[in-house]
């Protein structure tokens, strides 16, 4: 993959694939009853120490036994 390929528009098939991955990731988290509570606790701790309200969670692709969640925090200046 070259640098120029990074800026090309994705085709509809690639976009549909990405959307399906998001749906499947969300369905996997629905099976874990503690996941939403854990997210709320993480947000509370982050807000306590950073005073940031701009926090985003993203579920990353993992294998079937491990789920990875990425947290993006936008810190105020």
UniProtKB/Swiss-Prot annotation:
The domain of life for this entry's organism is Bacteria
Please list the GO biological process terms of this entry. cell division; regulation of division septum assembly
S-S pairs: none
The protein's matches in SUPFAM superfamilies, at most eight in alphabetical order, are given as: Cell division protein MinE topological specificity domain (SSF55229)
- Key words of the record: Cell cycle, Cell division
Kindly list any coiled-coil regions of this protein: none
Task: Spell out the family assignment given in the record's similarity comment.
Answer: Belongs to the MinE family.
User: What does it do?
Assistant: Prevents the cell division inhibition by proteins MinC and MinD at internal division sites while permitting inhibition at polar sites. This ensures cell division at the proper site by restricting the formation of a division septum at the midpoint of the long axis of the cell.
Indicate what this protein is called per its UniProt record.
Answer: Cell division topological specificity factor
Q: Please tell me the species this chain comes from.
A: Helicobacter pylori (strain J99 / ATCC 700824)
Give the taxonomic lineage as stored in the record.
Bacteria, Pseudomonadati, Campylobacterota, Epsilonproteobacteria, Campylobacterales
